[in-house]
Design a protein with these regions (language model features):
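Ankyrin-repeat helical register
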Residues: 299-300, 326, 330
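Ankyrin repeat structural motif
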Residues: 305-313, 335-344, 351
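Ankyrin repeat arrays, specifically the small/polar loop and inter-repeat linker segments at the C-terminal end
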Residues: 284-292, 317-324, 337, 347-360
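Extracellular beta-strand-rich solenoid/capping regions of secreted or surface-exposed proteins
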Residues: 48-50
Length: 368
């Protein structure tokens, strides 16, 4: 996993959970994209501590550091102030010591928190994300997790409103901690179940939902109101496994409450990665995609991905005149690969039936 970080320097602050397990407390790096290693200093990374990716006070327990640079590791004791470092050195403690002040003065290293974190991939053995672990990470867009993650602390993603993509490195039929993650993300987010080779088994869009309270009578009793189908979608689990049929059943009501910007990716994602899709649900999604075919095509052209575009026309969601329009748009945008592919698909999928010999003879006679 550290191969993805090999070209850069990373520094981790952590504390022991047990002799072989640690809790991550801080991450420093050169880039706002990080792959957290599964092992640090020979110990398994089991948890993200509270406020791990947020600028908040560190715990008062003994804190260790591990620095990774160019494929090599260095570990030792971490202290907050330079003065504390001098005190430890004067006491002839025989190990590396680094102060937080020294780390923060490093011109290359940035604390990966708040506005300087964009994407995080967690290791396979993490079981817990602490409370407020990503508090105020306003630029974070994507997080990747594994099925062993089952505990997510309160407000773990508070104010992470740009977090729109959640990658589950698991099969869609595996029990995961996805429900716990979604409970902390009330805004719209796309979840993809991906295998090790990157193949997407299923992609699900969870719409945003809102909570409000109405006061009932003088007794100061409050009634909770939920707006949006996103809440219902987030309940479609049994023993950690997502219930795809239950998820699909919310679509008819979502068509009443949600906008096309929400419904198009909901329908398209289920058709394109159609794991566990019933005939009834497929028919409902296909009807909607055909009704919105112009908007769907515009989205696909903007992404410049050939496989989904071919799927769109191959399945009959797009018409002949739309593929002609798509050729013109791709040409205008100077996407030559797209132009060539669209022209080939037009010939393949919308070929004119050849005239019979009798028709050809009749046309020749009339022309004569």
């Amino acid at each position: 996993m550290m191969e993805e970080n090999r070209a850069e320097q990373l520094l981790f602050l952590w504390e022991k959970i047990s002799e072989g397990e640690i809790r991550l407390l801080r991450v420093f790096g050169e880039q706002p994209v990080v792959t957290v290693p599964g092992f640090i200093d020979g110990r398994c990374v089991r948890e993200l501590g509270d406020y791990c990716f947020s600028r908040r006070k560190l715990p008062e327990n003994e804190i260790r550091y591990s620095r990774y640079c160019g494929g090599m590791w260095e570990s030792g004791l971490s202290v907050l102030k330079d003065k504390e470092k001098k005190d430890h050195i004067s006491s002839e403690q025989e190990e590396n010591i680094v102060s937080l002040e020294t780390i923060e003065r490093d011109g290359k290293l940035h604390e990966l928190s708040e506005k300087y974190i964009k994407e995080v991939q967690l290791p396979a053995d993490i079981v817990k994300i602490g409370s407020c672990a990503f508090y105020n990470c306003t630029k974070m867009e994507r997080i990747s997790v594994y099925p062993k993650l089952v505990e997510v602390g309160g407000d773990a993603f508070m104010n992470c409103l740009n977090l729109r993509s959640l990658r589950m490195c698991a099969g869609v039929e595996e029990p995961t901690g996805l429900k716990q993650l979604l409970a902390q993300i009330k805004w719209q987010v796309e979840v993809s179940f991906e295998q090790e080779d990157g193949e997407r088994e299923a992609v699900l869009l969870y719409p945003e939902y809102y909570e409000s309270y109405d006061e009932i009578g003088p007794a100061h009793i409050f009634e909770l109101n939920l707006t949006g189908e996103g809440f219902r979608a987030r309940q479609c689990f049994k023993e950690g496994v997502i219930l795809l049929n239950a998820y699909d059943e919310i679509f008819p009501q979502a068509c009443v409450e949600e906008s096309a910007e929400v419904l198009i990716p909901m329908a398209w994602n289920r058709l394109y990665a159609a794991c566990g899709l019933s005939l009834e649900a497929r028919a409902a999604y296909e009807t909607y995609v055909r009704e919105q075919s112009g908007k769907v095509l515009a989205i696909l052209l903007k992404k410049r991905e050939l496989k989904p575009l071919h799927f769109f026309f191959e399945k009959g969601y797009g018409r002949k005149e739309q593929i002609e329009d798509a050729v013109a748009i791709a040409s205008h945008e100077e996407w030559m690969e797209g132009v060539a592919s669209l022209i080939a698909w037009k010939r393949q999928l919308f070929a004119e039936p050849e005239k019979t010999a009798d028709v050809k003879s009749r046309y020749s006679f009339e022309e004569f």
